[in-house]
Amino acid sequence: MPVREVSRLPELNEILEKSDSNRLIIVDFFANWCGPCRMISPAFERLSMEFGNATFLKVNTDLARDIVMRYSISAMPTFLFFKNKQQVDSVRGANESAIISTIRKHYSSTPANPNAASDEEKKFLERFVGYTELRKMHTDEVFKALARSVMPDGISDRLENGEDEKKVLQELLDWFKNDFFTWFDRPTCLKCTLKCTTEGLNGTPTKEEKEGGAGRVEVFICNGCNSEMRFPRYNDPSKLLQTRTGRCGEWANCFGLILSAAGLENRFVLDTTDHVWNEVYLKKEQRWIHVDPCENTMDRPLLYTRGWKKQLKYCIAYGHDHVTDVTWRYVFDSKKLVTQERVRQGVLENFLGKLNARQMAGATEERKRELAVRRVCELMGMMVQEAKNQRIGWEKLGEDMGGRTTGSKEWRRARGELGDNPEAQVLGKPIEFRIQNDANHVEFSYDVNRDSYSQTPEKGFVAQTFECNNIQRKVENDWKMVYLCREDGKKEGNISWHFNLAPLVATDSKKTIEKVEIRMAGIRKFENGNILIIACLGDTCMRIPASGNLTIEDPKPEVLKITVTLSGGERNQAFQHAQLFRTEKDDVAEATESMVVRVYMK
């Protein structure tokens, strides 16, 4: 875990008080003017990543005087070790081996309570709490009345009169998808009518946007007239009845309110790999079914794993009075679930149990018994369906399932949700540099943050590639990192760019190419991941080193080929263990140079 700086004694006391009795707390007392403190700091950061069940803290002795006085610190650096709220050891001086030895002396890799969440697990689990508030809005009587005012006439009456629930539900889906709600990709400028091609930047919600539940807003700048366009990410479903546009989050949120208004008991399902949908309880069939308003489909739970080729991790369903894990419904083989990846299964079950109890607090005893019986039946149904799927087989199950249909093709491709799409492999043309008069060099670049190139076609990492196979652009919103890696489940990914150097000297017989500089930023390998980057020019090939920098002197004016192969890695996250262009996710206007090819002429 990252090292945390503590500035006040009450803050430190709270950490010690709340920590698990088996958790080791290490506090580094430092000063900015202290040379040994600066020397040992990188090692302290490294140790914080190595020992997961320990908390690493730093205290600036020039600022946190109350902590310094409490522990009588007189020399820097000093390291104090705490366990079960008590100081158990200390190390004075920048002695890395002594620090490691002391950590190992007191360290325990497991919490005293095996189901107690670690700090990292707590951070991950926090995301599940907010959606309980969302479901309360779906049961608001005023909101439901507003929803009924825009719905097709007679829906609720038809359900009350016993009409087939699935038939009515399909009509609702068709209406919502085709007549009511729209997909938001990028806006069209109201002034010059040009389609915006740039990514939205993070903006600050206005007072009005906040009143509609917008915690964030995407700001787009028109390429033609520089007009600003805003896309508030509204969470208030009644506001969405007015705006009637959004991405999957807005679709599932608004449709959840529509379902409640129609009298259909429903759940909001969150998938932590960035998709949401709904579930509806069919009273006659006594079962929950999958419903996706974006795709206008229902009762096709394997759509994501089999159709989109999406690797689901956690699927959590939120009813208005309960919360439950429904991941099994949406995977082909539960034995291969990767739910141990971010949080231990026992910790997840313990957390969801407490969250579910909180949601059920106002329910009657009769309702609680009903939910308990439903849950048992639901688990049995999942097991029976999985056995049936295994008999049918993976290939046959995919015959009526395709990739994702909502969103631009570039957006779906970047998310790896095109399914069995033959366009996953792209064969392009060699890139030709823009030649500027009086310039002694030309250059070409790619920015992984913006996912754009320096010349047209600009948008999407695939746009300028000569070949691209099994590669995706991965955005880690929780860690705020972005990079290229291979698609989940693929053993190898390849991407290449070809550059035609001949036109640079074709019009002037006296001009020659002096050198080519190549820079590939953010080359990262983890857990036995492999990255091979080769630059070929004519009959000569060179390996680009781990630094990502290569200079080719006196190159021939032929086709320069840069080829990247990503492979290796360990366990379920192997596809992420070889990363290209890894950088911090940044929403500011300045570009980042993930790849630069610069050609100098003489």
Swiss-Prot record:
Active site: C248 (nucleophile), H275, D292
Necessary cofactors: Zn(2+)
Claim: Transcription regulation is one of the keywords in the record: no
Positions annotated to bind Zn(2+): C189, C192, C222, C225
Chief location category: cytoplasm
Molecular function in Gene Ontology: metal ion binding; peptide-N4-(N-acetyl-beta-glucosaminyl)asparagine amidase activity
Family indicated by similarity: Belongs to the transglutaminase-like superfamily. PNGase family.
Role played: Specifically deglycosylates the denatured form of N-linked glycoproteins in the cytoplasm and assists their proteasome-mediated degradation. Cleaves the beta-aspartyl-glucosamine (GlcNAc) of the glycan and the amide side chain of Asn, converting Asn to Asp. Prefers proteins containing high-mannose over those bearing complex type oligosaccharides. Can recognize misfolded proteins in the endoplasmic reticulum that are exported to the cytosol to be destroyed and deglycosylate them, while it has no activity toward native proteins.
Protein name according to UniProt: Peptide-N(4)-(N-acetyl-beta-glucosaminyl)asparagine amidase
